[in-house]
Design a protein with these regions (language model features):
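A short beta-loop-alpha structural element at the N-terminal edge
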Residues: 1-16
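Active-site rim helix/loop that mediates acceptor-substrate recognition in acyltransferases
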Residues: 25-47
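Conserved beta-strand in the GNAT
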Residues: 47, 53-62, 72, 77
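Conserved acetyl-CoA pyrophosphate-binding loop and the N-cap/start of the following alpha-helix
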Residues: 82, 86-94
Length: 140
């Protein structure tokens, strides 16, 4: 079952950090980042637990622009030990439904092409690939 995280235990932080490492070798989750996310009204961290451990997570970030209210889905990862159980679909469906309740116009996400199963899931859920230049500037 998907839950929106509002507080956490030391074990939750350990589980989330491990999941971020599975997402990318350079990704991590620490207490400062998690507290910032949980204290931001426009950031919604969703998790799925299995046997008391967080085994899947995704973050729904709401942005208000002059045109629309938009959501970005970030940091979606299911533990490699738990893949194939439908957790990714359950998590994504919950975030899509939450965005609808928040009157979001559209949801954006990016996904590494190497994440074949994730990309297939996003397309199955109705996401369409669109042509754009995606840029980032690392500041820290």
């Amino acid at each position: 079952m998907v839950e929106e995280l509002s507080s956490y235990t030391p074990q939750d932080l350990t589980d989330l950090d491990a999941l971020m490492h599975e997402l990318s070798a350079t990704s991590f989750c620490n207490e400062e980042l998690l507290n910032s996310a949980l204290n931001d009204a426009n950031v919604h961290v969703y998790v799925i637990r299995d046997e008391g451990h967080i085994v899947a997570t995704g973050t729904l970030c709401i942005k208000h622009t002059l045109e629309f209210t938009i959501a970005d889905i970030e940091s979606v990862v299911v533990s490699s030990k738990c893949r194939g159980r439908g957790y990714g679909k359950e998590l994504m469906t919950a975030m899509i439904e939450a965005a609808k309740k928040m009157n979001v116009h559209h949801i954006q996400l990016t996904s590494n092409p190497a994440r074949v199963a994730a990309n297939r899931l996003y397309q199955e859920l109705g996401f369409e690939r669109y042509e754009t230049n995606c840029y980032k500037m690392i500041l820290a």
